């Protein structure tokens, strides 16, 4: 009886961890979302000079407001909501370049 009780408790403790474990492809999905957002932002905020992608990304992400709007865009992508996606990207302020 004790053995069954301990086994049941162990299963109940371990089960949520299995259920909420990240998919091995979740980082790939996040990278794809990030690339999509950066590609669309580059169309909206075209740099005048020759900036590397990394330097351009740092300039865009320097503003806390832009970081929030980009997070909103990522959530919109996850929810497959194109209207909110473009609305969030429209709020991003292009830095002086």
From Swiss-Prot:
It comes from the Bacteria. InterPro entries: YicS_fam (IPR048144). NCBIfam families: YicS_fam (NF041639). This is Uncharacterized protein YicS. The gene is yicS.
């Amino acid at each position: 009886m004790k053995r069954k009780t301990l086994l049941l408790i162990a299963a109940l403790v371990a089960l949520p961890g299995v259920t909420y474990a990240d998919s091995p492809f979740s980082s790939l999905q996040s990278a794809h979302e990030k690339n999509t957002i950066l590609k669309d932002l580059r169309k909206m905020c075209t740099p005048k000079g020759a900036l590397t992608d990394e330097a351009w990304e740092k300039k865009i992400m320097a503003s806390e407001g832009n970081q929030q709007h980009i997070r909103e865009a990522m959530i919109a992508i996850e929810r497959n909501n194109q209207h909110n996606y473009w609305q969030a990207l429209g709020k991003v302020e292009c830095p002086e370049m």
